Amino acid sequence: MTMTHAQNNHHARLIDGKQVAADVRANVAEGVKARIDSGLRPPGLAVVLVGEDPASQVYVKNKTKACEEVGFLSQKYTLEESTTEEELLKLIDTLNEDNAIDGILVQLPLPTHMDADNILERIKPDKDVDGFHPYNLGRLAQRMPVLRPCTPKGIMTLLARTGVELRGKDALVVGASNIVGRPMGLELLLAGCTVTITHRFTVNLPAKVSQADIVVVAVGRPGIVKGEWIKPGAIVIDVGINRRDDGALVGDIEFNEAAERASWITPVPGGVGPMTVATLMENTLYAANHLHKD
């Protein structure tokens, strides 16, 4: 009886993504200062935005602001919606050859007349600070990561902050996108977890969630994972960010119900989101220090 009572009063500890991201950015700023103090140039990040998608404009603003805060050289290229794929590829070629630029970021989604895969593959792998290039995903799959996809790597930083040993844990990734789900599975595998990735053809999602010590959900559908499915004591990471009809921002997981069962949980907003940009800064500094020696 007491145990049930204790469990009912249980509330997960929050993983504060804002705080961890601030720590990561402070470390990057120190690294930039050390570079400049030793006579090297500041790391450079080029951000390319095509068209006028409002969400993309906000993301680009956040990224360029973060660049300036840590002392990077930040170059922003805003192209018309009507820009041809050929013109964008030409810009990428120019940035690939620019020694002041360590990272090239093309903000997604791109207009429908462009082949995003073709464009992302044109970025030199050693400047692919988003970690989307097949070369970088392949390195991660072969256990020799160089530039790692930002959101999964940021989540690994959050998991490290819990102090929980990841080896041997059963980890479940809900959602199999190229940007989050698949590389997330590879990151957890690298950390010694036993990994399951679920997708639209998965049968009996609740049973799979209820077995998992670590649950990472990245689907973009509010409440797709019910709180009652969570295994007591699990670590819950919510990558989703959805706007409800009443204007509230919510994740993919039923937060309040999940927080009653989990040991650790990320809030939305203020969980995974800030880590993506902080990790982009980390990757750009890494590229400057280790991949570009000029």
UniProtKB/Swiss-Prot annotation:
Known pathway: One-carbon metabolism; tetrahydrofolate interconversion
Annotated residues for binding of NADP(+): G175, A176, S177, I241
InterPro entries xref list: Aminoacid_DH-like_N_sf, NAD(P)-bd_dom_sf, THF_DH/CycHdrlase, THF_DH/CycHdrlase_cat_dom, THF_DH/CycHdrlase_CS, THF_DH/CycHdrlase_NAD-bd_dom
Top-level division of the source organism's lineage: Bacteria
Record field: catalytic activity: (6R)-5,10-methylene-5,6,7,8-tetrahydrofolate + NADP(+) = (6R)-5,10-methenyltetrahydrofolate + NADPH; (6R)-5,10-methenyltetrahydrofolate + H2O = (6R)-10-formyltetrahydrofolate + H(+)
Keywords of the record: Amino-acid biosynthesis, Histidine biosynthesis, Hydrolase, Methionine biosynthesis, Multifunctional enzyme, NADP, One-carbon metabolism, Oxidoreductase, Purine biosynthesis
EC number: 1.5.1.5, 3.5.4.9
Molecular-function GO terms, alphabetical: methenyltetrahydrofolate cyclohydrolase activity; methylenetetrahydrofolate dehydrogenase (NADP+) activity
CDD domains in UniProt: NAD_bind_m-THF_DH_Cyclohyd
One Pfam family of this chain: THF_DHG_CYH
Cellular component per GO, a single term: cytosol
Quaternary structure note: Homodimer.
Function: Catalyzes the oxidation of 5,10-methylenetetrahydrofolate to 5,10-methenyltetrahydrofolate and then the hydrolysis of 5,10-methenyltetrahydrofolate to 10-formyltetrahydrofolate.
Protein family according to the UniProt entry: Belongs to the tetrahydrofolate dehydrogenase/cyclohydrolase family.
Name of this protein: Bifunctional protein FolD
Gene: folD
